[in-house]
């Protein structure tokens, strides 16, 4: 059996909602590295806000114990956690954060070290960039062996 992959983009709100649906039992099937540090998580949020290219999260449609259709996260748990932590004010922007978008009246954005709530209050247009950031998602279908190979290939890890 082959693998079929289709690409999607999700907003931050989609990822936030997905986090609650996944639960602890659905952590990614591939663990490529140690958990992200706070600095790496903050840099991911910085990249979201500033529109830098991002690796896709990888999901699979499946059924839960009750037979409901759910998504299983195959790769990208740390990205989900970074989004959720920033949305819940448990993560701050990097100290050297530079906003690479347009500002109101050319003002300088000094949001380094701020939580999302602080950014919303002082720089609402920066917070809006986080809220509307598009996150790439690869939705794959196939058996578990093929799915593992698919994710490995997405990350350049040839067997």
Region locations from a protein language model:
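Basic- and aromatic-enriched surface patches that contact anionic nucleotides/nucleic acids
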Residues: 2-10, 29-159
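A short, surface-exposed helix-loop junction/capping segment
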Residues: 21-30
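N-terminal intrinsically disordered, low-complexity segments enriched in P/E/S/T
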Residues: 15-16
């Amino acid at each position: 059996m082959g693998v079929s992959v289709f690409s999607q983009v999700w907003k931050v709100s989609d990822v936030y909602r997905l986090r609650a649906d996944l639960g602890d039992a659905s952590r990614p099937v591939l663990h490529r590295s140690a958990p992200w540090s706070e600095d790496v998580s903050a840099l991911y949020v910085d990249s979201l806000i500033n529109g830098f290219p991002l690796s896709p999260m990888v999901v699979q449609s499946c059924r839960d114990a009750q037979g409901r259709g759910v998504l299983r996260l195959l790769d990208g748990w740390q990205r989900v956690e970074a989004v959720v932590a920033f949305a819940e004010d448990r993560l701050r922007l990097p100290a050297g954060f530079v906003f690479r978008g347009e500002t109101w009246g050319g003002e300088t954005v000094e949001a380094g070290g701020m939580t999302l709530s602080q950014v919303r209050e002082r720089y609402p247009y920066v917070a809006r960039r986080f809220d509307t950031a598009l996150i790439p998602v690869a939705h794959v279908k196939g058996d578990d062996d093929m799915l593992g190979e698919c994710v490995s290939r997405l990350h350049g890890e040839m067997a």
